[in-house]
Structures are given as C-alpha cells and as structure tokens.
C-alpha cells in the first residue's frame, strides 16, 4: 500500500499582505533605479504580480514613491525617537551621552539601507520629482525626528545642563554639527567611514554643540 502524498495548498495573499509586497518590491526598485528609471511594470515584476495588481493599490508612480518614502521615513523617525529617549532620558555625562546619541543617530543609515539609497536618488533627482513629494517626506521624516530631539534637548536644558532658548534651533544644530558631517562624508551611508573617523567627527561636533549651548556661553 502506497504512502499517501501530502497535498500542498497555496493560500492566496490577502489585500493587506499583497499591498505590503508591492511596497517592499517598490522600495527595492526605487533604491536601485531611482525615480526616473523606475516603472510600475518593473515593480510588478519585482513583486511577482501583474501590472494591474500594482495599479489596484497605487494609481501611479508618484503615489507609489510617496508611499515608500513615507513608510521608510516613519520607521527612521521612530528609531531616532527611541535613540533620543535612551541617550537623553537620564544624562550622567553630557559630552559622552551626546556622543552616544550622535552614534545612535547614524544607525538608521545601516538599519534602513534601501530607504537611504532612495534618499540619495531623491537628492540627485529633486528637480524632476513631482510637486509636494519632498515637502511631505521632510515633514514625516527629518522634521518629525528633530521635533522629538528638540523635546529631549529642552528637558536636558531644564536640568541646567544646557542653555537652549529655542529647542528646535538646537536640535537642528545638533544634527548639523554631530551627525551631518558623517552623513555628508559617507554620502548618506553609501560609503561607510572607518569607525575612528566617525568617532572623530562626532567628538568634534559634540564639542562645538556644547560650546554653543553650555550655560553662560556667548552666542
């Protein structure tokens, strides 16, 4: 008597799962090809779907890019919010804690490589992007993260460790001085820097930040 063979039944993906599949495929394609060279057909092929299936969830390439950017930006902003809370929640050594925050602020470059590949394309193709995409991305991502950083810096100032009249301005200066040079030199993570160079840039930025915002400093 033969052994009965198991029957494998494929369960069709539901709408929510299929939409996530399209977004993941689009993220990979936009990361490789950028805005100009990405097509809905290429996204459908990457997702293993018919082009009509992609069109069911996203009416055009603009809506798809915006959805991918906002989804990635939300993940990055959430990670940076956690970093600010962890490193500024209880400050014991201001310089060391700010340096640790600076390193943590850079971790999304490696944690979300496809998102930052898209960001690099966005920078290069800014003049060709649909109207409104850049503003919505900035609002959902970088500005949201800086708002949370500003809130934590203001709490640090209330403890007398910093003198910050404008928390939003201070958050912008932190990003500019501490993480900005690493982002710039590494081309948004495309060419990672040696650890010693990253540490040197962060230390220099933190020193400048403390000089600007230490109690009694002249600005």
PLM feature segments, named:
Residues 15, 23, 69, 73, ...:
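Amphipathic, non-transmembrane alpha-helical scaffold segments
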Residues 10, 116, 135-139, 143, ...:
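Hydrophobic/aromatic-rich alpha-helical bundle segments in the mid-to-C-terminal region
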Residues 72-94, 188-194:
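Short, flexible, glycine-rich and Lys/Arg-enriched loop motifs at helix boundaries
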């Amino acid at each position: 008597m033969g052994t009965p063979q198991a029957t494998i039944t494929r369960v069709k993906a539901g709408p929510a799962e299929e939409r996530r599949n399209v977004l993941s495929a689009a993220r990979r394609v936009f990361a490789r090809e950028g805005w100009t060279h990405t097509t809905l057909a290429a996204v459908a092929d990457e997702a293993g779907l018919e082009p009509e299936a992609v069109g069911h969830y996203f009416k055009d390439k603009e809506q798809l890019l915006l959805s991918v950017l906002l989804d990635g930006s939300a993940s990055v902003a959430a990670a940076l919010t956690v970093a600010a809370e962890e490193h500024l929640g209880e400050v014991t050594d201001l310089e060391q804690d700010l340096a640790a925050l600076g390193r943590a602020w850079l971790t999304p470059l490696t944690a979300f490589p496809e998102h930052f590949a898209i960001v690099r394309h966005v920078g290069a193709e800014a003049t060709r992007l649909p109207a409104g995409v850049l503003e919505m991305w900035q609002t959902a991502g970088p500005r949201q993260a800086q708002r949370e950083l500003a809130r934590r810096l203001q709490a640090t100032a209330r403890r007398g460790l910093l003198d910050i009249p404008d928390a939003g301005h201070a958050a912008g200066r932190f990003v500019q001085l501490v993480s900005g040079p690493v982002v710039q030199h590494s081309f948004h993570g495309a060419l990672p820097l040696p650890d010693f160079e990253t540490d040197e840039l962060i230390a220099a930025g933190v020193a400048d930040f403390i000089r600007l915002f230490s109690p009694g400093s002249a600005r």
